[in-house]
Every structure is written in C-alpha cells, then in structure tokens.
UniProtKB/Swiss-Prot annotation:
Source species: Methanosphaera stadtmanae (strain ATCC 43021 / DSM 3091 / JCM 11832 / MCB-3)
InterPro entries with a match to the protein in the record: Class_I_gatase-like, PdxT/SNO
Matches recorded under SUPFAM superfamilies: Class I glutamine amidotransferase-like
Pathway(s) where this gene product acts: Cofactor biosynthesis; pyridoxal 5'-phosphate biosynthesis
Record-listed E.C. numbers: 4.3.3.6, 3.5.1.2
UniProt-listed PANTHER family: PYRIDOXAL 5'-PHOSPHATE SYNTHASE SUBUNIT SNO, PYRIDOXAL 5'-PHOSPHATE SYNTHASE SUBUNIT SNO1-RELATED
Protein name: Pyridoxal 5'-phosphate synthase subunit PdxT
C-alpha cells in the first residue's frame, strides 16, 4: 500500500485529496492519502503533494518544521502545483526559502495577479488537458536534466526532474486525473 501525503497548510488541500483518491481508485492501486503538517506526519508517506498558496509562507513552514531538510534528505517524490512548483525550483525572482530539487528558475505570478487568472486547453505530456491558471508562475529557465511536460504560449508550465514534478497550474480543480496518475506512477516506482 502507498500513502500520498498532502501538505495541509494552504491551497486546495481537500481538492488534491479527492482527486488523488479518485486516481488511486481508477488505477486500482491500494493506496491512501494523508494530510501532512509536521515531520511526524510525513514519516509513513511515500510521496508528497505541495499545493498552491503563498510560496514564501509555505517555504518558511517547511524550514521551521524540519520538513525541508527531510524532503531533501529522503528524496521522496513530490508533486508541486503553483506555489509548490516555485518551492521545488532552485531559483525564483523573489528572495525566499526553496527546496531546490528541480534545476529551474521560476517567475512567481508570471502570468499576472489574481484578476489575470485564466483557463486554457493545453497539451500535457502530449495529452489534451484543461489548465486552470490562478496567479500562475512559469518556468523561465531549466537545465538539460529537466524534462518539459507542458508549455503555454511558449512558456514552460510543467516539468519533471527525477522523482519531482512541478506544475504551474491547478490540476486539482479539474476532474481530470492525468497528472495525479503520473505522480502516483512515480511514487510507485520509488517504493522499495
């Protein structure tokens, strides 16, 4: 059985939990989700989802609780959406705590503020997908080790490096389990 942790601090936590459980069921995988807020919470998790919110606040929480060091040391798979993508990157246009697990540079709020949020049909990993962008960042630079999963308007909006997946938009706000299934497969491949 696998356990997917969902950081229970900000963002669409419940929505991530619902769509992850839906994806597990569709894939017929014995798994569960668990809300995570402390180091003790994450110890039995095989993967972690970091959702949207204020990335600097989430980053400070990860450092204060010891979760940041734990995530770097253990290498458990992480799906980061919106603010989670920012946290996974090595660099951003703001001075803030980062996990630095994806060799990328991210522009926070790259597509604009709240009033400039939008939805668009995109290709994700060569599949049709409905992207929901809310104060979305984009990736301005990547190393050769980073795989591009999606672009919008020539801007990189989804990447994967090793067991880390970063998404600029909000897959938890759709009914489409494509991205969560990709993450679950990554978690499964890392479980010994």
């Amino acid at each position: 059985m696998i356990t997917i942790g969902i950081l229970d601090l900000q963002g669409d936590v419940e929505e991530h939990q619902i769509i992850t459980e839906k994806a597990l069921k569709e894939m017929k995988i014995d798994g569960t989700t668990k809300l995570v807020n402390t180091l003790d919470d994450i110890k039995d998790c095989n993967g972690l989802i970091i959702s949207g919110g204020e990335s600097s606040t989430i980053g400070m929480h990860l450092e204060k609780t010891g979760l940041s060091n734990y995530l770097k040391e253990t290498g458990i798979p992480i799906l980061g959406t919106c603010a989670g993508l920012v946290l996974l990157s090595k660099k951003t246009d703001q001075d803030q705590p980062l996990l630095g697990l994806i060799d990328s540079t991210v522009k926070r709020n790259g597509f604009g503020r709240q009033r400039m949020s939008f939805e668009s049909e995109i290709k994700f990993n060569n599949e049709d997908y409905h992207g929901i962008f809310i104060r979305a960042p984009y990736i301005s630079q990547i190393s050769d080790d980073v795989e591009v999963l999606s672009k919008y308007d020539d801007k990189i909006i989804a990447v994967k490096q090793n067991q880390y997946i970063g998404i600029a938009f909000h897959p938890e706000l759709t009914e489409d389990t494509l991205i969560h299934k990709l993450f679950i497969l990554e978690v499964e491949s890392c479980v010994v």
